[in-house]
UniProtKB/Swiss-Prot annotation:
GO terms for cellular component: nucleus; transcription factor TFIIF complex; transcription factor TFIIH holo complex. GO terms for biological process: positive regulation of transcription by RNA polymerase II; RNA polymerase II preinitiation complex assembly; transcription by RNA polymerase II; transcription elongation by RNA polymerase II; transcription initiation at RNA polymerase II promoter. Pfam families: TFIIF_beta, TFIIF_beta_N. It is found in: Nucleus. This is General transcription factor IIF subunit 2. Belongs to the TFIIF beta subunit family. It comes from Rattus norvegicus (Rat).
Length: 249
């Protein structure tokens, strides 16, 4: 850091406030396709009964997605994205930029955190289905060789990957944690089939430790505490592709 020279603190001196916003991966990929410094969408900030409501609308010419996971596709990205506002939580967060000459500049201090989420729509559910289908395809494919393969590979009692997997299973009980995005994909796929699940069934479907699974479920789901669906989980409204049923008390 010392070798990079001076640090420009103009942003701190001007007390510039910035927002730290988490956006879906597909949205950042579509932004990257915008020509030059072109417009990517519109941000709307409004007051509703004293509460601040923020939403982002993606430009129509950036809504077409032509590939998913490197494979050709034809689907429209959701255009409407309401924000879920969050507090900074007593943290001091700053934003820096680095120029081509390695000069660091402090652009501002984070005054608001938020998550940009797609509004529930047919486009979003179709996109999720394609992503889930793509992620469920086998990474390795078998291919018949037309000649003898000569290598120096020798059989081993156990591969390093399996050894590491077994070690993780022992550390985390009987189940090893999978990548969070993979677990989310499995959950979305399950909720495509049924609206309600009890935790035991979701554990059987995902093969994940109960504590880890509940952490992820709390981000996308709601646990019903009364009515005919008591003790079951369902998706939060923003992730649903169906109309909400009226629940009995």
């Amino acid at each position: 850091m010392a070798e990079r020279g001076e640090l420009d603190l103009t942003g701190a001196k001007q007390n510039t406030g910035v927002w730290l916003v988490k956006v879906p991966k597909y949205l950042s990929q579509q932004w990257a396709k915008a020509p030059g410094r072109g417009e990517v969408g519109k941000l709307r900030i409004a007051k509703n009964q004293g509460r601040t409501e923020v939403s982002f609308t993606l430009n129509e010419d950036l809504a077409n997605i032509h590939d998913i996971g490197g494979k050709p596709a034809s689907v429209s990205a959701p255009r409407e994205h309401p924000f879920v506002l969050q507090s900074v939580g007593g943290q001091t967060l700053t934003v820096f930029t680095e120029s081509s000459s390695d000069k660091l500049s402090l652009e501002g201090i984070v005054v608001q955190r938020a998550e940009c989420r797609p509004a529930a729509s047919e486009n979003y559910m179709k996109l999720k289905r394609l992503q889930i289908e793509e992620s469920s395809k086998p990474v390795r494919l078998s291919q018949q060789a037309d000649k003898v393969v000569t290598t120096n590979y020798k059989p081993v009692a156990n591969h390093q990957y399996n050894i590491e997997y077994e070690r993780k299973k022992k550390e985390d009980g009987k189940r090893a944690r999978a990548d969070k995005q993979h677990v989310l994909d499995m959950l979305f796929s399950a909720f495509e089939k049924h609206q309600y699940y009890n935790l035991k069934d979701l554990v059987d479907i995902t093969k994940q430790p109960v504590g880890y699974l509940k952490e992820i479920l709390k981000e996308i789901g709601i646990q019903n505490v009364k009515g005919i669906h008591k003790n079951t989980w369902e998706l939060k409204p923003e992730y649903r592709h169906y109309q909400t049923e009226e629940k009995s008390d």
